[in-house]
């Protein structure tokens, strides 16, 4: 268990470092997790309130399927949104879950929030999401952002399926949560969506400028 925990810790730390280099952790926002064991379910999750651009021995907390620290004496609190991660590991085959707040994903979530989804089509990066068909289209659900975390988690859980190994949900004026079978897969999904957000916003802006 200790060896597996250390291995997963390093994997998650590597992802956190890459995302921090992209400046995706504004104001200590965001949360990351990686599964350590299946039976019982345990996973490492970012500690609450930490500056994720820094690397310390207290970056992550090992929690159980209820989102509570495995070691009750640990002086750290898991992320306030740990419940979303527990649902991912209970209801899907994922091994890693990432959540970031970026300007682009917040703008997209507000522009399309009333529609409850945004669709992307015709961009090569969609293949990174596992869609290889020509002219493949991907739909990303957008949910509201209630202040009460259990309500948010309940909305989020509606988009999780047992057969799912990867996926994403955009939370309105909040951020995106993605999951994947491995840390590298979850990071790939996150990068692909953030690329699509940035591309779509720039394309829309430039198209309007060309028209005028």
Curated annotation (Swiss-Prot):
Zn(2+) binds at residues 99, 101. GO terms for cellular component: cytoplasm. GO terms for biological process: L-methionine salvage from methylthioadenosine. One of its GO terms (molecular function) is zinc ion binding. InterPro entries: Aldolase_II/adducin_N, Aldolase_II/adducin_N_sf, MethylthioRu-1-P_deHdtase_MtnB. It is an enzyme of class 4 (lyase). Its EC number is 4.2.1.109. It catalyses: 5-(methylsulfanyl)-D-ribulose 1-phosphate = 5-methylsulfanyl-2,3-dioxopentyl phosphate + H2O. Binds 1 zinc ion per subunit. SMART domains: Aldolase_II. Its cofactor is Zn(2+). Keywords: Amino-acid biosynthesis, Lyase, Metal-binding, Methionine biosynthesis, Zinc. Pathway: Amino-acid biosynthesis; L-methionine biosynthesis via salvage pathway; L-methionine from S-methyl-5-thio-alpha-D-ribose 1-phosphate: step 2/6. HAMAP family: Salvage_MtnB. Belongs to the aldolase class II family. MtnB subfamily. Catalyzes the dehydration of methylthioribulose-1-phosphate (MTRu-1-P) into 2,3-diketo-5-methylthiopentyl-1-phosphate (DK-MTP-1-P). Homotetramer. This is Methylthioribulose-1-phosphate dehydratase. It comes from Bacillus pumilus (strain SAFR-032). The lineage of its organism: Bacteria, Bacillati, Bacillota, Bacilli, Bacillales. The gene is mtnB.
């Amino acid at each position: 268990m200790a060896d597996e925990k250390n291995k997963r810790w390093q994997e998650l730390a590597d992802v956190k470092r890459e995302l921090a280099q992209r400046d995706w952790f504004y104001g200590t926002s965001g949360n990351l997790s990686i599964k350590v064991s299946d039976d019982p379910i345990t996973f490492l999750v970012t500690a609450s309130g930490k500056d994720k651009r820094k690397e310390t021995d207290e970056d992550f907390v090992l929690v159980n399927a209820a989102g509570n620290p495995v070691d009750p004496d640990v002086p750290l609190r898991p992320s306030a949104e740990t419940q979303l991660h527990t649902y991912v590991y209970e209801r899907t085959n994922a091994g890693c879950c990432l959540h970031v707040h970026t300007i682009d994903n917040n703008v997209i979530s507000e522009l399309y929030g009333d529609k409850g989804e945004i669709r992307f089509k015709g961009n090569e990066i969609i293949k990174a999401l596992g869609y290889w068909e020509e002219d493949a289209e991907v739909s990303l659900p957008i949910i509201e952002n209630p202040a009460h975390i259990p309500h948010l988690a309940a909305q989020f859980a509606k988009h999780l399926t047992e057969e799912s190994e990867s996926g994403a949900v955009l939370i309105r004026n909040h951020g995106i949560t993605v999951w994947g079978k491995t840390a590298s897969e979850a990071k790939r999904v996150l990068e692909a969506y953030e690329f699509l957000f940035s591309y779509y916003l720039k394309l829309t802006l430039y198209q309007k400028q060309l028209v005028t």
